[in-house]
Amino acid sequence: MSGHSKWATIKHAKGAADAKRGQLFTKLSREIIFAAKQGGPSPEGNARLRLAIQKAKDSRMPSDNIERAIKKGSGELEGTTVIEMILEGYGPGGVAVLVNGMSDNRNRTVSDVRHMFSKGGGSLAESGAVSWIFEAKGVIGVETAGLDTDELSLKAIDMGAEDVNTDEGYMEIYTAMPDMEKIRQQLETQGVTIDSAEINMVPKNTVKLDEETAMQVLKLLDKLEELDDVQTVSSNADFDPEVVEKYHSQA
């Protein structure tokens, strides 16, 4: 892989704040509902649902909430119709941004995302404008305190991982989509505690930014993720760790 944005690491650093916003479980439920509706309520035969449930468990979502979301998706319980959409845009400095949204009202979501792009010094673009820059990859997150990161990196590569990034006490292990669950299980078998494992849109190449532009892009990505209808946000910006630390100290 020729580049990554370290956005998983950045999001990990602010994960506690996300939970305080009270949106986390709502977004996790939405993903489960959509997955169950698309592929059925059985995790064994529905890979997307299986991953959504595991992500919810990783985030300590109560099992009752998970079961209720599955039942809403399968139609056993009444729920709103959820649609998925991929919105594309440009941030400050021409950074490519990919927004994964889920909602019951596409027009509202598009309007909210467009407004946030405009407010953050960017612009919403047409479909296909930047999606070609990204590819879907499995990203496994591991807290590395007390671990030999060199040894863990080699283990992950031996298990079939494509790339590894270690930064600020956190490791991202990048895999091909079909290999993520297998590699996660192998790591857990060897006693590695997994913090998160999800499918992310990872940039094929990244762009370096000056500090001022990087701060603007970080703010835009944060504001987009804070929108109720936005599930995930990806960009092709390569953020300097010192700039990220400065941004969070001012946030």
UniProtKB/Swiss-Prot annotation:
It is found in: Cytoplasm. One of its GO terms (cellular component) is cytosol. GO terms for biological process: regulation of DNA-templated transcription. Keywords: Cytoplasm, DNA-binding, Transcription, Transcription regulation. Transmembrane segments: none annotated. InterPro entries: Integrase-like_N, TACO1_YebC-like_2nd/3rd_dom, TACO1_YebC_N, Transcrip_reg_TACO1-like, Transcrip_reg_TACO1-like_dom3, YebC-like. Signal peptide: none annotated. Belongs to the TACO1 family. PANTHER family: TRANSCRIPTIONAL REGULATORY PROTEIN YEBC-RELATED (PTHR12532:SF6), TRANSLATIONAL ACTIVATOR OF CYTOCHROME C OXIDASE 1 (PTHR12532). HAMAP family: Transcrip_reg_TACO1. This is Probable transcriptional regulatory protein cbdbA400. It comes from Dehalococcoides mccartyi (strain CBDB1).
